[in-house]
Amino acid sequence: MTLRVDESVQGTWTVLRVSGELDLVTSPGLRRQVHAVVADGRRDLVLDLSGVLFCDSIGVGVLIASRRLMRSCQGRLRLILPARGALDGSHVNKVLAALGVRRLFEVYGDVGSAADDLAEPISA
């Protein structure tokens, strides 16, 4: 399977909707798009991972590197996991939790709440 990344804007937030598999082969594409967002001067980024069916440790590495990049330029990164999965069941959430890095990310249930500066993230 491949990785697809669609870009949109909601308020001040750039939203990258990611679908498919996030792994060794496909992860560089997401990394490039995150870097392009920063190069364009945008500092608020939502990664919508609700369409990601598989994520390996390389994919998690790209998520961590994206967080580091956004923080280094005083930006913000928020993740969206599948509706129920944000709390328990999604593959991505399970991988993040198993690797002990879920707590590093602000996770929201949908784009609307992720792009709302008053909304609270889902607890880890």
What do the predicted segments below correspond to?
Residues 1-53, 65-124:
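STAS-like cytosolic regulatory interaction modules
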